[in-house]
Amino acid sequence: LSLHDALPIYGVIKVVSGYTGGHVENPTYQEVCSGTTGHLEAIQITYDDDIISYDELLNIFWKQINPTDDGGQFGDRGTQYKTAIFYHDEEQKNIALESREHLENSKIFDSKIVTDIIPATKFYEAEENHQDYYKKRPLNYNMYYKGSGRYNFVKSHWDGNNINREELKKTLTPIQ
């Protein structure tokens, strides 16, 4: 899930880019990219659970990644780009495990789901130039999004599983 995908979503209050899961304190982007810190690039989401549930956020997450690739994501290769869900308590862990199992059972993907579900550890905020990157450099972000293969991957796996808006419009009354 990128910042671009998490905002604006009703109920999401704040999204911060950063690093987590490793053994180096206060890692820099360069250190994380070296693949030697054990950290993954991640985002930390603050949300209002009266408006959006953890499960709903997970459903959004699954539709932004390739959960079958344990070597990174699209154009970003290396363990620091592997997908993971970091949980903060047993309830989140169970919801995440159920969500992953549901995705696996859906057979949307031909390969095994390899996204890890692991306890949250200290989160280190990324440098300022990595915050809101999609807003600061929209052209670069959009070129990467399409050029990396992510756009086509997401479209090919999820468009058929989304509501056909034109068909839905036919069922609505004029007031709706």
Locate the predicted segments by residue.
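Flexible coil/turn and secondary-structure edge motifs
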Residues: L1-H4, P8-Q176
